[in-house]
A protein has these predicted regions:
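Charge-rich, low-complexity N-terminal segments
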Residues: 1-102
Length: 102
């Protein structure tokens, strides 16, 4: 399964510094998990089995909650049992169609 999620503090003292720092701690948790992942300006995407992915999301959320009593969490999942490599394969497929139809 692939899960795209965004976690951020909604209450911080210095908005610019603390929000980025809290999000960085969440991303650090995801990267340390060893699961395939990517981070962009809106979401962090992680791939793996249900229990392992949601354990990482919980740990990342807890990292943000450590600096904010109120936290926003958005989750979107593509659940396809037994399918791996979708983080890159989906994008590669779209790019292939774009290249073929120039």
């Amino acid at each position: 399964m692939i899960v795209a999620f965004s976690v951020a503090p909604t209450v911080v003292g210095d908005e610019s510094a603390e929000m980025s720092e809290a999000v960085a701690e969440a991303v650090r948790v995801v990267r340390a998990s060893g699961s395939p992942n990517e981070t962009n300006s809106m979401f962090t995407i992680i791939e793996g089995e249900w229990d392992e992915v949601f354990a990482v999301i919980k740990e990342a959320t807890d990292a943000v909650r450590a600096v904010s009593p109120r936290t926003s969490l958005v989750i979107k999942a593509d659940i396809r049992e037994g399918v791996t490599g979708q983080i890159t394969q989906k994008v590669d497929s779209v790019n292939r169609y774009l290249e073929e139809n120039k």
